Amino acid sequence: MKFVDEATIKVDAGDGGNGTVSFWREKFVAKGGPDGGDGGDGGDVYLEADENLNTLIDYRFNRFYDAERGKNGGGTNSTGRRGEDITLKVPVGTRAIDIDTGEKVAELMAHGMKIMVAKGGWHGLGNTRFKSSVNRAPRQKTMGTKGEVRELRLELLLLADVGMLGLPNAGKSTFIRAVSAAKPKVADYPFTTLIPSLGVVRARGNKSFVIADIPGLIEGAAEGAGLGVRFLKHLERCRVLLHVIDILPIDGSDPVQNALTIIDELERYSEKVAGKPRWLLFNKTDLLLEAEADEKIAEILEALAWEGAHFKIAAVSRTGTQEVCNELSDFMDTLPKEIMTDEEKAALKVDFMWDDYHKDAMSGKNVVTEDGDDDDDWDDEEDDGHVIYARD
């Protein structure tokens, strides 16, 4: 199946049903009084994470999703039926962004997690609600509110423990092929990898972790150059970043400048991502004599003023790759589990202030008065039943 990690959809929650103006009429009961019921609430729209899905491709073909409208109220104080909700299944790791406001509406990080993204309209009030000692036959009602309409950008963030980054042709795909069963395309030209790939890595002690191969970055990626931020986002949930540096680039470029380009793009994209633990992997060391490779690596480390973890590998021959995996596994055991901040939790909440509508309604705002005969014109000879005043 084609990997699709972005889609744009429009969700339309159901409108609330209108309240009804109705009066009970019964033989020998001249003035039965109001019995208009409330409408039903409109249906809501939810996103739910499903571990059986791994792409957003379905939402490329169907972009519009509507919840059901609430039914209008009826006579005999009958409340209208609530509109049916709709639930859209998405892969685990999906987040939803409101295109108009840029607000993060939802981020679904676990199977079964369910978040409302559009609230249905509130029900209108029937005329029974307006009965009082001075208004015995009210013809007032309120209309249901409109359901929320949102245009959402769905983004699928790969859930990996380790993310690989580097310039095109640095050897990221070769490394992931060497340490896992993943088989991303490998060739001797830039941008061979056009979509992210995931691989499961086995480490010592019967441990395992997931590694993500991210398409190569170029200068300006944080602003969308090349494959841009579309794939930088996949690093947000990684616990460790592996920065692959080609010590002998085929185009003759400077490895130090290449490394600085990646570092700069990370910092421009997100301070949080740039602050994640990052290890350097010096690749293609088999193209030089061991002493030459060591000297080259030392020069790069000095130029970068790098004091963090670094490894010398030759991914094509798998030299040093298993050592990296074992060290990664041990290192991640020491990392604390990520805990969402209060600010991040607040960003996931969707607040709807619908109670104000009913307060306004009962105070005289948003009220519709139906036309009808005078209150006293009740005919005792009418058949049993009730009269509903309705306006189309």
From Swiss-Prot:
Organism: Aliivibrio salmonicida (strain LFI1238) (Vibrio salmonicida (strain LFI1238))
MF-aspect GO terms: GTP binding; GTPase activity; magnesium ion binding
UniProt keywords, alphabetically: Cytoplasm, GTP-binding, Hydrolase, Magnesium, Metal-binding, Nucleotide-binding
Pfam families tied to this protein: GTP1_OBG, MMR_HSR1
CDD domains found in the cross-reference section: Obg
Main location: cytoplasm
Binding positions (Mg(2+)): 173, 193
Record Gene3D superfamilies: GTP1/OBG domain, P-loop containing nucleotide triphosphate hydrolases
Acidic residues bias locations: 370-384
GO cellular component, one term: cytoplasm
Name used for this protein in its record: GTPase Obg
GO terms of biological process kind: ribosome biogenesis
Record EC number: 3.6.5.-
Gene coding for it: obg
